[in-house]
Curated annotation (Swiss-Prot):
GO process terms (BP): response to hydroperoxide
A cellular-component GO term for this protein: cytosol
Pfam families to which the protein is assigned, alphabetical: H2O2_YaaD
UniProt superkingdom: Bacteria
Name used for this protein in its record: UPF0246 protein NMA1114
Family the UniProt entry places it in: Belongs to the UPF0246 family.
Length: 259
């Protein structure tokens, strides 16, 4: 069983990682192709392409200019500790022990517009390139065309090497679109997290993102290898709802008063 997650726009570049172990991204040669093109963009072009402020555009122009290989602990940081959004706050990898970090490394993969597919301990340098960005490149009009089946093939290889036949999709639609599900050689399970509001259960983005990270933390803390055991996930008041679920979409609900 493997999990896939989206990355985060917010990055923690300052705090040192709590572990020294690191690996290198498998698709760094592809990242280098993209970065060569990104470096050609002026800050104003970045602002228009990514729909960000001038300040953020300037920051990322500087990041692009400084991006260089090889990655080392001195100029890069492990992805799971660099990403700093709602999902990663829910996971809170900084407080996991060594065995639990190894669980993440062995069973979690992070989708990325620039890096394709990352292991949690893969070193990365700061960047901003969301998968849904309409960034015309050498292979097409956007990043989905750039990556093609590269991410899917690496996922299939990863699953095969581990003897696994299940992929738990905890990524956003924007990122999971980079995976060709028709060519994916695995059973696909997509957990859905719903919160009660005014008597109705609905997906609330902030809570759903945090819950994705919480589920990965739950799996690591309980060393889960059987997907069925994920139905016992109960962090922060969530509970599996069998009646609302089907074989591929597992729904977890949380009542309003529990928060």
């Amino acid at each position: 069983m493997f999990f896939v997650l989206s990355p985060a726009k917010n990055l923690n570049e300052k705090d040192p990682a709590p572990v020294s172990e690191f690996t290198q991204p498998d698709l760094l040669a592809e990242s280098d192709i993209l970065m060569q093109q990104l470096r050609e963009l002026a800050p104003q072009q970045i602002a228009e392409l990514m729909h960000v402020s001038d300040k953020i555009a300037l920051l990322n122009a500087q990041r692009n200019a400084e991006w260089n290989t090889p990655f080392t602990p001195e100029n890069a940081k492990q992805a799971v500790f660099m990403f700093n959004g709602d999902v990663y706050e829910g996971m809170d990898a900084n407080t996991l022990n060594t065995d639990q970090i190894q669980y993440l490394q062995g069973r979690v993969r992070l989708l990325s517009g620039l890096y394709g597919l990352l292991r949690p301990l893969d070193l990365i340098q700061p960047y901003r390139l969301e998968m849904g960005t309409a960034f015309a490149n050498l292979r097409g009009k956007n990043l989905y065309e750039f990556w093609g089946d590269i991410i899917t093939n690496l996922l299939n290889d990863t699953l095969a090497q581990a003897g696994s036949n299940t992929l738990v999709n905890l990524a956003s639609q924007e990122y999971f679109k980079s995976v060709n599900t028709k060519k994916l050689r695995a059973r696909l399970i997509t957990p859905i997290f719903k919160d009660e509001k005014n008597g109705k259960y609905k997906i609330i983005s902030f809570y759903a993102k945090r819950a994705r990270g919480l589920m990965v933390r739950y799996a690591a803390e309980h060393n889960i290898t059987d997907p069925e055991m994920l139905k016992n996930f109960n962090y922060e008041g969530y509970a599996f709802n069998d009646a609302a679920s089907n074989e591929s979409e597992w729904v977890f609900m949380r009542s309003e008063q529990i928060k």
